């Protein structure tokens, strides 16, 4: 039984990589990340990079976000974003296609923290309870899969809205419920 986010994310990523290996004989590939440096890159092709996950290289977690906003984030979100470097991964959950957000490099980690700060500032301004995004919905520009910072639940939220739907009781369970999708 998988009991922590780091293990659950590692297990899912392994399944994702295995699916790509089975379908193509190569690691996962991305056109969006072409030209963006990362230790994950195993080879570069014609406007495409192939990647494999790498250990997260920094000691710090999301401390900059916590200090900037005087907030304590759920331990699960720290583990989600600081256990590995990888490309974003296409997944399905209950028939919906999502893009699971990952950290690609140390520079990307800085951008992620800036985006989380912006997300949390917007929520505070709109008097919404704090969340940290983990995925985007491919079918809905405003739909975001997030971790509720108060309860630790995984939710679907409409950006800037009070509309929220609980998807899973915790991040470990959610990572165990999503399925990898092969998309070129």
Curated annotation (Swiss-Prot):
<dbReference type="Pfam" id="PF07348">
    <property type="entry name" value="Syd"/>
</dbReference>
<keyword id="KW-1003">Cell membrane</keyword>
<dbReference type="InterPro" id="IPR038228">
    <property type="entry name" value="Syd_sf"/>
</dbReference>
<comment type="function">
    <text>Interacts with the SecY protein in vivo. May bind preferentially to an uncomplexed state of SecY, thus functioning either as a chelating agent for excess SecY in the cell or as a regulatory factor that negatively controls the translocase function.</text>
</comment>
<keyword id="KW-0472">Membrane</keyword>
<dbReference type="GO" id="GO:0009898">
    <property type="term" value="C:cytoplasmic side of plasma membrane"/>
</dbReference>
<protein>
    <recommendedName>
        <fullName>Protein Syd</fullName>
    </recommendedName>
</protein>
<comment type="similarity">
    <text>Belongs to the Syd family.</text>
</comment>
<dbReference type="InterPro" id="IPR009948">
    <property type="entry name" value="Syd"/>
</dbReference>
<keyword id="KW-0997">Cell inner membrane</keyword>
């Amino acid at each position: 039984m998988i009991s922590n986010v780091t293990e659950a994310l590692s297990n899912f990523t392994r399944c994702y990589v295995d699916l790509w290996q089975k379908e193509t004989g190569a690691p996962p590939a991305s056109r969006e990340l072409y030209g963006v440096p990362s230790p994950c890159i195993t080879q570069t092709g014609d406007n495409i990079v192939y990647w494999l996950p790498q250990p997260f290289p920094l000691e710090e977690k999301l401390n900059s976000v916590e200090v900037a906003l005087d907030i304590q984030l759920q331990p699960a979100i720290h583990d989600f974003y600081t256990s590995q470097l990888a490309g974003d991964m296409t997944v399905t959950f209950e028939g919906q296609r999502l893009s699971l957000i990952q950290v690609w490099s140390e520079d990307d980690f800085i951008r992620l923290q800036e985006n989380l700060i912006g997300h949390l500032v917007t929520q505070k301004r709109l008097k919404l309870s704090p969340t940290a995004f983990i995925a985007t919905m491919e079918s809905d520009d405003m739909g975001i899969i997030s971790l509720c910072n108060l309860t630790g639940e995984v939710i679907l939220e409409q950006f800037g809205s009070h509309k929220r739907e609980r998807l899973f009781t915790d991040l470990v369970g959610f990572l165990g419920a999503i399925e990898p999708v092969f998309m070129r």
